[in-house]
């Protein structure tokens, strides 16, 4: 069951001409796609490459939904595609496989007050700097300070902001930060060759093909200055941000006046990913990343048959790794659909109906919904008792029901007590 939210625009009639958002009077809403550095209207297309390329009305900011007035987009639409009467729909689809690719969120700069996050407008995240660099971004590719729109001459990048910090609750490495910081620093130098770029880092983890050479190029050819050490404080002085930190290689403290500070904040699982994992009976770790069936042999499969993983929902990874994993997941799905019959593991639970007392404790603990209730009848057709029955098509052989059974009437096929004892006696 899929909830399709109402967009209040008829996809069959809309041609994507853009007249509606050009005429919309509500124009100062922070844009999610531009990381809240730019603005959008109350009717908008989420991003230029959206599929379908049809706008959606933000009902929380639309004057019609707030006050019952306006309707300008409806009046100017040449195809009469605006439909304020639309409602959310529940769509039911029968599918043979599911690929979970929920993506990730980045930690917000506001969570790092000691680094100026939330206090200074010119302290931004790497994602925001990415949008500033883009020619279709809020500044049309010009590197300008968010506070006063002046050109940036000195920029300081701070790596591992939130990553590998136990007190922030994120002990893992975000994996992508070292490389995108090097990329951002190089792009800044390309756009402003006379500008200065500094990078504070703890360790450079450039473990991919050509990654180490890329970082060396940033240092040796582009003149990016790397300082190994932590930043202790950021404060304002004479209209600039002063970054105070340590250079552990020289054993000195440094202060750098900067126009812009970019925080390489940690990545974490997408909000709501745990809820989705629970719906599909997929386990996840303490950080919220979904668990694969086997880290080496079955890296894109899960404990639930027919459910596969792709991208950062499984662990932090960059674009090449995400594409490779998505291709592997798609191949697994095609392999699943290529045969007329589906294979399953023989190690499924089986119930001894003669000893089952019908307490159904197993039913409540089964994460896959494989336990069903079965009526046992005599020769006359009268119901003698109701017992548990395992659907072998759904059972994954996890053994949760075996542990929960009070009368010890459930076993895993191939692992019954008498079979295990026989194997031991044969040694």
Describe every region a protein language model picked out.
Residues 1-427:
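Residues forming the flavin
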């Amino acid at each position: 069951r899929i909830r399709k939210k109402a967009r209040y625009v008829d996809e069959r009639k809309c041609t994507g001409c853009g007249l509606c958002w050009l005429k919309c009077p509500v124009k100062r809403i922070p844009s999610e796609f531009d990381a809240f550095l730019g603005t959008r209207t109350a009717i908008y297309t989420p991003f230029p490459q959206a599929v379908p390329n049809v706008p959606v009305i933000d009902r929380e900011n639309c004057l019609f939904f707030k006050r019952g007035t306006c309707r300008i987009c409806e009046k100017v639409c040449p195809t009469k595609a605006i439909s304020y009467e639309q409602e959310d729909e529940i769509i039911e689809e029968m599918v043979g496989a599911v690929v979970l690719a929920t993506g990730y969120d980045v930690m917000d700069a506001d969570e790092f007050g000691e680094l100026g996050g939330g206090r200074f407008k010119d302290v931004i995240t790497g994602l925001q700097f990415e949008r500033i660099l883009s020619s279709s971004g809020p500044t049309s590719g010009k590197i300008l300070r968010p506070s006063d729109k002046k050109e940036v001459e000195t920029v300081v990048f701070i790596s591992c902001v939130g990553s590998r910090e136990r007190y922030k609750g994120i002990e893992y490495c975000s994996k992508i930060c070292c490389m995108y910081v090097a990329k951002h620093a190089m792009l800044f130098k390309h756009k402003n060759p006379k500008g200065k770029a500094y990078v504070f880092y703890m360790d450079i983890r450039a473990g991919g093909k050509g990654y180490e050479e890329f970082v060396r190029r940033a240092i040796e050819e582009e003149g990016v200055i790397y300082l190994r050490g932590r930043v202790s404080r950021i404060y304002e002085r004479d209209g600039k941000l002063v970054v105070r930190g340590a250079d552990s290689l020289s054993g000195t403290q440094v202060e750098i006046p900067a126009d812009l500070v970019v925080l390489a904040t940690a990545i974490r699982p997408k909000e709501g990913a745990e809820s989705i994992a629970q719906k599909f009976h997929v386990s996840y770790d303490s950080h919220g990343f979904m668990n694969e069936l086997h880290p080496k042999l079955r890296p894109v499969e899960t404990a639930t048959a027919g459910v596969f993983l792709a991208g950062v929902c499984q662990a932090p990874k960059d674009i090449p790794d995400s594409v490779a994993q998505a291709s592997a997941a798609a191949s697994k799905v095609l392999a699943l659909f290529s045969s007329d019959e589906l294979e399953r593991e023989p190690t499924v639970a089986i119930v001894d109906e003669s000893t089952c007392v019908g307490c159904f404790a197993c039913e409540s603990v089964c994460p896959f919904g494989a336990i069903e209730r079965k009526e046992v009848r005599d020769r006359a057709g009268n119901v003698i008792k109701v017992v548990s029955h395992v659907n072998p098509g759904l059972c994954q052989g996890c053994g949760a029901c075996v542990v929960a059974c009070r009368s010890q009437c459930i076993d895993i096929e191939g692992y019954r007590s008498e079979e295990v004892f026989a194997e031991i006696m044969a040694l």
